Amino acid sequence: MRTRIKVCGFTREDQLAQAARLGVDAVGLVFYPPSPRNVSIEQAQALCRSVPPFVTAVGLFVDATEEQVREVLRQVPLTLLQFHGDETPAYCQQFGLPYIKAVRVKPGLDLLQYATDFASARGLLLDAYVAGVPGGTGERFDWTLIPANLPLPVVLSGGLDPDNVTEAINNVRPWAVDVSSGVEQGKGNKDLAKMAAFIDGVRNADV
């Protein structure tokens, strides 16, 4: 199976276009003001103009109000939503777009029950648990905590980079991988060489 690749946290149009040319499957835009990768609606509109056909534009939200999400959707052509907070299944379903739900994995968390609760999601994005931080920490978690029989596609995140993504895929065999800080020079500033090396690492695992 070919592992899908999402790069999250774009803030520059040229870097998003470079990622698309390298072959990523999805690009993530962050709508969460505390994040250094947060983009305004105007920035997001410009970034989406660099998204070619068949590349998914993903909007990331963290405990946003319903109106905040709808305001973005009225103006930005997103095709998938990603929720990173304490959103309920009913909340996530109400926007009429497919969504993935992020889970901060730690010992004792029942991922099978979580997948049952969020059966309407297109997948679960598994990230590292860091107290008080909703994601984008650059920390990895214990992959053995992932049940082999999860009923939803797994999007593996959390501390992935060009040096460990091949190992991660060989261990977990996820549907997709998600990276942000692992391919950056600084927060929100993507590194072309790191993105290319990350994609090569994914392809090496898929052979």
What does each of the following model-derived ranges do?
Residues 1-207:
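Conserved N-terminal beta1-alpha1 strand-loop-helix module at the mouth
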